[in-house]
């Protein structure tokens, strides 16, 4: 028997005529809040393009949209007829516009859920308890949380939890153009950084297109990049996420120095030079490379030998080179 959404598609049903997003924003006197890093995207051609970048959305799929705001991208998602649409919006001021969209979408037999919550604290497994549906994560992210949210989701992906209990959960997200370029930056690239390596350990990030800042209201000072992150079927490491993140963060803490400088800050000063030299030799990585010249595989080998070092020297895991040194008081 055909699923409800499939029947809707076959019958040619569409969303009923509605006011434009620009008209709704004006009608409900909605203004973007700077403290929430809000920027409204009014052009439906662009919201359609974002959703198209997510790839095929089947009638049995579930879409989780982050920060729908007045509902521009939401409309574009509804036109693709997923079985379920789950919205997570922190700002309750958008309740009336989102409720209007929900009512207009009711003839399409799409399960439409709205949650007013902070996505950084939102328990996805509680609201999506089973893994029978493929999940698409889509969002025009507030700049203030975009990097933190991506790191959180990469952590979930590494642990196969939350939205990533299935390996086919893709992320299609907006970032400041510079951040988007960093996520996708190749080895040796000017923008290569910690975020590049962490993203590329567990996903294949693809820069889909750039949205000029003038397309948003209010206009941000930067352009916006749309990135699709496709989980790798075979992750490049089985090491714990937090360990890889710690090693990569230290390596890139001195981006323009030899990579041994940042990596060395993982180790206590007493025998730092000697131990670091041995670890680089075991990892078969040249210690005079700059961090941005390291491949993902080289970073992971450095993480692996560090992990092995902790087996014999577990106290090193607690070492923090930024901690104040003990000073003898006379």
UniProtKB/Swiss-Prot annotation:
S-adenosyl-L-methionine binds at residues 38-41, 67, 89, 118, 140. Pfam families: RrnaAD (PF00398). Keywords: Methyltransferase, Mitochondrion, RNA-binding, rRNA processing, S-adenosyl-L-methionine, Transferase, Transit peptide. CDD domains: AdoMet_MTases (cd02440). InterPro entries: KsgA/Erm, rRNA_Ade_diMease-like_C, rRNA_Ade_Mease_Trfase_CS, rRNA_Ade_methylase_Trfase_N, rRNA_adenine_dimethylase, SAM-dependent_MTases_sf. Residues 1-84 form a transit peptide. Belongs to the class I-like SAM-binding methyltransferase superfamily. rRNA adenine N(6)-methyltransferase family. KsgA subfamily. Encoded on a bicistronic transcript that code for two proteins mtTFB1 and CG42630. This is Dimethyladenosine transferase 1, mitochondrial. The lineage of its organism: Eukaryota, Metazoa, Ecdysozoa, Arthropoda, Hexapoda. The gene is mtTFB1.
